[in-house]
Amino acid sequence: MPTATAPARRRRLAGALACVWLSVTAPACVAEALRMADEVLVVKSERRLYLLHDGQAFKSYKVLLGLNPLGPKEREGDFRTPEGHYLLDGRNAASDFFLSLHVSYPNGQDVARAQRRRWSPGGSIMIHGLPNLPRRALKYYQTSDWTDGCIALTNDDMLEVWLLTRPNTPLEIRQ
């Protein structure tokens, strides 16, 4: 009998985890789901992600950032988390980091800034969970800025953000 591929196993695991999580938290989740986020705000200096509805935060999560978190992302490989206005323009249920939401980085300002210096602005910025195949102890991923520039949450928090956002939800990232 052939064995399942790694992406297929990850999808099944993500689905099973989602079912377990929903069965445990369904009443609270249903109440919160009535209030979907119409905007997401990340405040880097606070290490917080806020889900907003009509301009009011209704959920807040601890986040970890790129290895070089101070200042806006300027170029590919600088390990910084961008700052500015973006969209959550893609969803990946088969991510290497549990689940991921794609950030529409770079925007026009990011591209112009990088071009002035003849740099590549980089890309592939995500909001995501923890690595499916961690290389370090779990505590590292929960206490240290560790990404290449992405915004990381615990898997439980990532699942909530996934469920409470829609495609193309506006995202603001500020210092």
Description of each model-found segment:
Residues 1-8:
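N-terminal secretory signal peptides that target proteins for export/translocation
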Residues 9-18:
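N-terminal export leaders
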Residues 25-27:
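N-terminal signal peptide c-region/cleavage motif recognized by signal peptidases
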Residues 30-79, 83-85:
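N-terminal secretory signal peptides
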Residues 34-35, 77, 90-175:
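Exported/periplasmic cell-wall-interacting domains
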